Amino acid sequence: MPADVKAAQSSAGDSRPGERDKALDLVLGQIERNFGKGSIMRLGDASRMRVETISTGALTLDLALGGGYPKGRVVEVYGPESSGKTTLTLHAIAEVQKRGGVAAFVDAEHALDPVYAASLGVDIENLLVSQPDTGEMALEIVDQLVRSAAVDIVVVDSVAALTPRAEIEGEMGDLAVGAQARLMSQAMRKITGNIGKSGCTVIFLNQLRLKIGVTYGNPETTTGGNALKFYASVRLDIRRIQTLKRGTEEYGIRAKVKVAKNKVAPPFRIAEFDILFGRGISTLGCVLDLAEETGVVTRKGAWYSYEGDNIGQGRDNTIGWLEQNPEAKDAIEVLVRQKLTEGSEVTANSMRPLAAAARSAAAKPSAKTADTDKKLVADGAA
């Protein structure tokens, strides 16, 4: 080995940690002077370790997301028509406004119902609303709102309605292949960095389309190309799985949300909750579901019981009891949150199987099973 190489390796090995630290501090200071404070930082800084969240309005979905929508990130919510996408985001807006935050709604579909939004708890007097003419206008408005650092949440409804200017100015039937995908790709490159710096959460609602000629696998895809899929930190797939009825009257739907992507918590979790027509997400229903799964409320047959007392026959009657007894409801919710904080087995990976297991465990055992259990207890005592 040449002597100069040996000398270089020796000098590199003999360099003192103090000198390396000085060199690192020097280059970090130079980078911050050139590009601004915060352009480079240590990942372990206390201000960067924990990602703050915004509540979704559904306790079960908050659990599945690891706390709620992450601040300073892009979120995509997609699903078929009438599945609860807009309702979900209006609840997020209401939660932000309750805490004194500022919310904006970019209504590209021109379909926002102020009366319905107000019924969900949205302060429509202070809600910023834009109904843009083109997709470029909508995304430029989003970018300016984000860069202001004065807005906490921006909702875009929806990506499918972000029509490029060239398509609007052209004639009906003209082909504009890939125009919307190029628009979204350029916008996401520009907006994402500003979103992280400002701490604003931007939620894009999206529609489903079917791929042509797909024989195997899922033929469903979202509009606007692939850029949003990559830039989104959280992607939620919401589906309508049941229609809630009282007799022949329909009063709501049962929604199921799958966390298709999550960069800030474990993905692929599933949450279910009720959406009541004209009232939005049933918070009492979420509390009852988690109370049953954590064992705070037990169910035998059709009866729900709390602290040994029957509180309602059937789910609807039990929810009515919780509504009439707010103190008991608050106590149950506190116990549920304590169990979840202590690391309960409920992880929201699949809410329905856990509930089924709890019901089967609470069911009355057969005589043969009871005899077996007695034998096992006797053997354990021996």
Swiss-Prot record:
One of its GO terms (biological process) is DNA recombination. Residues 370-382 have a biased composition (Basic and acidic residues). PROSITE patterns: RECA_1 (PS00321), RECA_2 (PS50162), RECA_3 (PS50163). Residues 1-20, 360-382 are annotated as: Disordered. Gene3D superfamilies: P-loop containing nucleotide triphosphate hydrolases (3.40.50.300). Residues 360-369 have a biased composition (Low complexity). The lineage of its organism: Bacteria, Bacillati, Cyanobacteriota, Cyanophyceae, Synechococcales. The keyword Thylakoid does not apply. ATP binds at residues 79-86. One of its GO terms (molecular function) is ATP hydrolysis activity. Its main location: cytoplasm. Pfam families: RecA, RecA_C. It is found in: Cytoplasm. Keywords: ATP-binding, Cytoplasm, DNA damage, DNA recombination, DNA repair, DNA-binding, Nucleotide-binding, SOS response. GO terms for cellular component: cytosol. Belongs to the RecA family. It comes from Synechococcus sp. (strain CC9311). Can catalyze the hydrolysis of ATP in the presence of single-stranded DNA, the ATP-dependent uptake of single-stranded DNA by duplex DNA, and the ATP-dependent hybridization of homologous single-stranded DNAs. It interacts with LexA causing its activation and leading to its autocatalytic cleavage. CDD domains: RecA. Coiled coil: none annotated. This is Protein RecA.
